[in-house]
Curated annotation (Swiss-Prot):
Active-site residues, Swiss-Prot/TrEMBL: 176
Organism for this UniProt entry: Hyphomonas neptunium (strain ATCC 15444)
InterPro entries to which the protein is assigned, alphabetical: L-lactate/malate_DH, Lactate/malate_DH_C, Lactate/malate_DH_N, Lactate_DH/Glyco_Ohase_4_C, Malate_DH_type3, NAD(P)-bd_dom_sf
EC number: 1.1.1.37
HAMAP family in alphabetical order: Malate_dehydrog_3
Keywords, comma-separated and alphabetical: NAD, Oxidoreductase, Tricarboxylic acid cycle
Protein's UniProt name: Malate dehydrogenase
Family recorded in the similarity comment: Belongs to the LDH/MDH superfamily. MDH type 3 family.
């Protein structure tokens, strides 16, 4: 049986962390790609030299040519410029759209059968553009955002309640930005909806509201603390969870940026929704029932994503 091949397009902080985790978990052979000569080779060699310590039998290679990703089963895209303090994800649009064009063309030419996970911000617009540039089937191109945002939500809930993260199921939908929608009614701690936790005195409504707001600002909190970059450990782990569900046909339902073709009343756009990920890629979108407040928040988030998509079309007319 042939080994899986994982191509990591972008060898910065997230790319390097992805390579380390993928190697340690033996998901397959790892190719690190970057346009910066020496960077993917150096990180690949460093991680390869660590594998005898933990006994992982994987091959790692760094490349500067898209030909090196040929035949990849999974491509995880982190290429682009990260956020700096004071920047929103949307500020990256013009720069990273050009990067997505080059990446999409590279994947189309050398790894057209891959399952593609995009991490580059602004996420929802970038994954939409990447699918257009690559021409891959929409079910084979997804964005990593909701897994990360939901993980942050779950961690903050665990921190407040003292309950293990293993018994917390948090959902965050919508665009990956300040208008994201942490789903209070659909998230649970020990099986109890968060609304019931408030009623039982685990936390006040004000404390829950603060956790929801901290979740929305979670990425910015880390950017401000680091001062020279953005989060990379949690984003990498989130993408690995998505890749594993695809490679092992786990059929996990994860909140990811998926292509909507009528679901949630949306067409021809990517946004964060619960998605069943298996060997076919994004196999099915799960549709939550929204109350009036949730729908209003989701619609606002969708409007923000639509604005970014329209901006992409303005920058690159080939996307119109």
């Amino acid at each position: 049986m042939a080994r899986n091949k994982i191509a990591l397009i972008g060898s910065g902080m997230i790319g390097g962390t992805l390579a380390h985790v993928a190697a340690r978990e033996e998901l397959g052979d790892v190719i690190l790609f970057d346009i910066a000569e020496g960077l993917p080779q150096g990180k690949g060699l460093d991680i390869a030299e660590s594998t005898p310590v933990y006994g992982a039998s994987v091959n790692l290679k760094g490349v500067n040519d898209y030909a090196g990703i040929a035949g990849a089963d999974v491509c995880i895209v982190t290429a682009g410029v990260p956020r700096k303090p004071g920047m929103s994800r949307d500020d990256l649009l013009g720069i990273n759209l050009k990067v997505m064009k080059a990446v999409g063309e590279g994947i189309k030419a050398h790894a057209p059968n891959a399952f593609v996970i995009c991490i580059t911000n602004p996420l929802d617009a970038m994954v939409w553009a990447l699918q257009k540039f690559s021409g891959l089937p929409t079910e084979k191109v997804v964005g990593m955002a909701g897994v990360l945002d939901s993980s942050r939500f779950a961690y903050f809930l665990s921190e407040k309640t003292g309950v293990s993260v293993a018994d917390i199921h948090a959902w965050t939908l919508g665009g990956h930005g300040d208008d994201m929608v942490p789903m209070v009614r659909h998230s649970t701690v020990g099986g109890l909806p968060l609304t019931q936790l408030v009623a039982q005195g685990w936390m006040s409504q004000a404390e829950l509201d603060a956790i929801v707001e901290r979740t929305r600002k979670g990425g910015g909190e880390i950017v401000n603390l680091l001062k020279t970059g953005s989060a990379y450990y949690a984003p990498a782990e989130s993408a690995i969870a998505m890749a594993k569900s695809y490679l092992a046909d786990q059929k996990r339902v994860l909140p990811v940026a998926s292509y909507c073709s009528g679901q949630y009343g949306l067409k021809d756009m990517y946004v964060g929704v619960p998605t069943l990920i298996g060997a076919g890629g994004a196999e099915k979108i799960v549709e939550f029932d929204f109350n009036a407040d949730e729908k209003a928040m989701f619609d606002k988030s969708v409007a923000s994503v639509n604005g970014l998509i329209e901006a992409c079309k303005g920058i690159d007319p080939s996307l119109a």
